[in-house]
């Protein structure tokens, strides 16, 4: 059982805050820096880190991730000034990313080739209704099976409609 962390990069408005941290001011402490959850995650040995919606992330996030994901480097600089702390990625940390790649997806960006080269690409088909029911039942064990079946049915109909020539979704 490995520690896991989830980061929705598509919803990140400020990549630096999400991936590095923030500077704060307190009248008693003065100015201080607080590291992000991402910094904690990469310092956690054997962690599994999910970078969701990588293709929706701001390019600044990609730039920050380049050295973190490069197997030959595996570090994060908190600041580019001399003498600033460099965070090494802990042993056994695994990164997994999701991305919707292609022109048919809205609000996505074409991923930088250097960034893509840091991953093994696995293309996945959509789940069929039975697989989707099974996954939803696993993820939401307290939800009634009839509700789960309805959600999977509606999702399937929505996907078919979205891909039709006369989409009304």
List each language-model region with its residue ranges:
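C-terminal helical "lid" subdomain and adjoining coupling/linker elements of P-loop NTPases
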Residues: 160-169
